[in-house]
């Protein structure tokens, strides 16, 4: 049998290993010069005004919501069809997540659905750039500006994504992820990009105990003046070990995304006549980062359900993923919102399947996946 083909595998080479070794030998391994380098490189690459490196994108979401003063009695609009961390952070701040449905074919939030969900208690709107494609930001920004509500972009899937003439993260506030399966990784990490001067100052303060200055800053200043707590904060800083990996990964991002694009093109050609339904791409100008390649497995059309298909692929040593089961179908949120019905999110939750996609995949790997899919489906039709 062929060796196991994972759903994702980080493209780590000698450069990343050497970068980590350099940090380990430097004598300074926590937040320091590599974090500053990462933030500077990110701003240079994507044209953003400020970048704040953090321990995770979840930490970034938490700090951004907190910096905006969101708390009990407030509402935050976001799709249920996303990773649960966003909804979790809203709840942990005592606010109410207003989970809305998405377009069945793109998994993007619909602008009119967002507009209808706005109330006098709405304090933020969080759209998700899904699978590497951008939301229609012009319309969403217009709605947010008209209502006087901050727009926070969940850009965990959108590293290297462009919307019309701008990079995601170039304008407004966007939160990125360097998790192990992302387009650029440092195992665990995240970053907030923003052009809001006041917001970034509060985020920088909150990320490290509310001190407003990190350990490296204090070290190079000889710990004078002594830092003081401005307000209670968290410990969400990123180590330089992780940042060093991210710096190298960012330098490779363009080439890695090009390879992702080639893999997706090969998948798309092989599966164009398949009963598996691929995601539709937006009809406005954009550059797709191809973080995920997903198909929908509709049993009525394919003769097999998603879970059975994933199990059959596993038996052939092919890994898959699920991105995502809608948050409102998870136990805690089912119990909290028993009447909430979001048909498009629910349909996608039981049909979505993410196929292997990572830069080091060979064309033979792609063909192995598509051949296996066609073989399995042909047995059930």
From Swiss-Prot:
Originating organism: Photorhabdus laumondii subsp. laumondii (strain DSM 15139 / CIP 105565 / TT01)
Record's keyword annotation contains Lipid biosynthesis: yes
Cofactor: pyridoxal 5'-phosphate
CDD domains per UniProt: AHBA_syn
EC number: 2.6.1.87
Family assignment from sequence similarity: Belongs to the DegT/DnrJ/EryC1 family. ArnB subfamily.
Name of the protein: UDP-4-amino-4-deoxy-L-arabinose--oxoglutarate aminotransferase
Entry keyword set: Aminotransferase, Antibiotic resistance, Lipid A biosynthesis, Lipid biosynthesis, Lipid metabolism, Lipopolysaccharide biosynthesis, Pyridoxal phosphate, Transferase
């Amino acid at each position: 049998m062929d060796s196991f083909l994972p759903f994702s595998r980080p493209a780590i080479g000698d450069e990343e290993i050497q970068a980590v070794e350099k940090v380990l030998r430097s004598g300074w391994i926590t937040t320091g010069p590599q974090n500053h380098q990462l933030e500077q490189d990110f701003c240079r690459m994507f044209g953003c005004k400020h970048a704040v490196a953090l321990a995770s994108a979840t930490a970034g979401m938490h700090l951004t919501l907190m910096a905006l003063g969101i708390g009990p009695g407030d509402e935050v609009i976001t799709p249920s069809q996303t990773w649960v961390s966003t909804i979790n952070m809203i709840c942990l701040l005592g606010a109410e997540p207003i989970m809305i449905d998405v377009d069945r074919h793109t998994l993007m939030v619909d602008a009119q659905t967002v507009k209808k969900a706005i109330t006098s208690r709405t304090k933020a709107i969080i759209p998700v750039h899904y699978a590497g494609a951008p939301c229609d930001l012009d319309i969403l920004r217009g709605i947010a500006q008209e209502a006087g509500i901050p727009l926070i972009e969940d850009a965990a899937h959108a590293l290297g994504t462009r919307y019309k003439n701008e990079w995601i993260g170039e304008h407004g506030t966007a939160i990125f992820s360097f998790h192990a399966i992302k387009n650029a990784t440092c195992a665990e990490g995240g970053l907030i990009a923003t052009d809001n001067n006041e917001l970034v100052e509060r985020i920088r303060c909150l990320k490290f105990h509310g001190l407003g200055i990190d350990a490296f800053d204090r070290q190079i200043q000889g710990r004078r003046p002594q830092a003081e707590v401005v307000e209670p904060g968290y410990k969400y800083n990123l180590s330089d070990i992780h940042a060093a990996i991210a710096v190298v990964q960012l330098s490779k991002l363009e080439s890695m995304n090009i390879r992702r694009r080639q893999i997706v093109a090969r998948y798309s050609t092989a599966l164009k006549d398949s009963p598996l339904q691929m995601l539709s791409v937006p009809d406005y100008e954009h550059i797709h980062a191809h973080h995920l390649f997903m198909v929908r497995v509709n049993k009525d059309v394919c003769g097999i359900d998603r879970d059975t298909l994933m199990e059959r692929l596993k038996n052939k040593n092919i890994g898959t993923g699920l991105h995502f089961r809608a948050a409102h179908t998870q136990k805690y949120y089912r119990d909290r919102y028993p009447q909430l019905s979001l048909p498009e999110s629910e349909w996608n939750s039981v049909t979505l399947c993410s196929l292997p996609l990572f830069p080091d995949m060979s064309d033979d790997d792609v063909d192995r996946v598509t051949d296996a899919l066609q073989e399995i489906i042909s047995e059930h039709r």
